[in-house]
Amino acid sequence: MSQKRVSVHALSATVVATLLAVGLTAGLPSPAQAAGTTYFISAAGSDSNSGTSSSTPWKSLAKINATVLKPGDTVSLRRGDTWTGGVVTGQSGTAAAPITLNSYGSGSAPTVTGGKSGNCIRINGDYTIVDGLRGVSCGYAGISITGDHDTVRNSSASNNAVGIKAGSGSDFGKYTGNVLTNNSIMNVLTRGTNCGTAQAVNCNDDSGASGVLINGNDNEFSGNTISGSNAFSYDYARDGSSFEIYNGNRNNIHHNVAVDNNNFSEIGRSTGTADGNTYRYNLVRATCGANCTQAKGLIARGPGTSFGPTNGTVFEFNTVYLNGSQSQAVVCHASCPSSTVIRGNILVGVKNSLWINGSGWTERQNVLNGPVNVVLNSTSTTAPARFLNAPSDLHLTGSSPAIDRAGTSPTAFDLAGVAVPQDGDCNGTAAADSGAYEFDSPNC
């Protein structure tokens, strides 16, 4: 990779191409599906048209919202067009014949703005695919999913409180190849009173600025690029997250790129649970100056807070690079659960590379650059990570202590599509590297 700064969009294209090439998007519905009716929508169309060909498209989103879609049906929006309002579907497809929302023609992605009840695209049914659409300035969420087994891919959202929402009860979804940019609006932003006292009011209620908000279970997020989820907060000074998990379980977050967000992922719960969430081969970088001063990578919790515990969190083979004066790469507080695993990462933070309390958790095979508050496992190191050209290129050099440090990996490819493991130190035995990138030595 070039040592010049790589743009967020270039990173996104690279990651998606890699995932497709190496088959890490397994589980996505096949392009081949049972035939149904295709409905065409164009800003230049007419609702008196048949809507069933690109030469006779409908015009309004209301027309499609009133249509009873059946398994195998497709709604195709013309590229280059913009609609104000919202797309809402409530019918379900099947595994063999999903309902699909996509685009036709040439030009920029079809855009929905303004929102309907705060959401530009809302999918309430099961087995529905959203492919290549855009939600901008929607009021709340660019794309909101409440059904099961839904797919959102190759889509984008910006200037919302939430880019993509996997809502409560939205399970077994696939989210890949999406670009979520500057979703930095706070949907709750109130100045608290009597904060720090028993009479405190509105001192812990600010929320928003999420690239992805996950309230569902067993969803997969891969190949996405999230940037600019970072906003002012009365309660927290700054707020925002690439992947916010609240009452969501067993979600798999892997091979994503997160740039200049306030947090990479914060996990919490209220009356539900937030257990068994995993993170692998993600690149997290926050170097945006004042707005990234307090950036964090992962925030997990124990039972000593009303938002915890977050049991069974696994965070491994990630590269986190934060340079703000109060930045912390991984935090697990309030008696961090013993089921937490922090393994095989490169963690760079100025205030803390790792802050963790409680007992019984697993920390090993990490490269940590920045203060830590615990005695590290003997398999971890605080030696400089030795990146190729930090912060713009966080691949490893041949002298990095991350090479061959992590033993085995459950994943066959790194963030760039390099096979794992490689014999990076040329000692005759291949082993996985710590961090999101595997070093493939040219010398052996």
What residue ranges belong to the model's regions?
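Secretory targeting and sorting signals
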Residues: 2-34
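Extracellular beta-strand/beta-solenoid scaffold signature
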Residues: 88-89, 114-121, 137-144, 159-170, ...
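Acidic Gly/Asp/Thr-rich repetitive segments characteristic of extracellular carbohydrate-active
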Residues: 43-78, 82-84, 416, 433
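Predominantly extracellular beta-rich ligand-binding scaffolds that present long acidic/polar faces
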Residues: 85-90, 96, 252-258, 271, ...
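C-terminal accessory segments
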Residues: 376-441
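Surface-exposed loop/turn segments connecting beta-strands in extracellular beta-rich domains
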Residues: 85-86, 104, 115, 136-139, ...
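Right-handed parallel beta-helix/beta-spiral solenoid domain characteristic of secreted/periplasmic
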Residues: 43, 57-58, 74-82, 90-141, ...
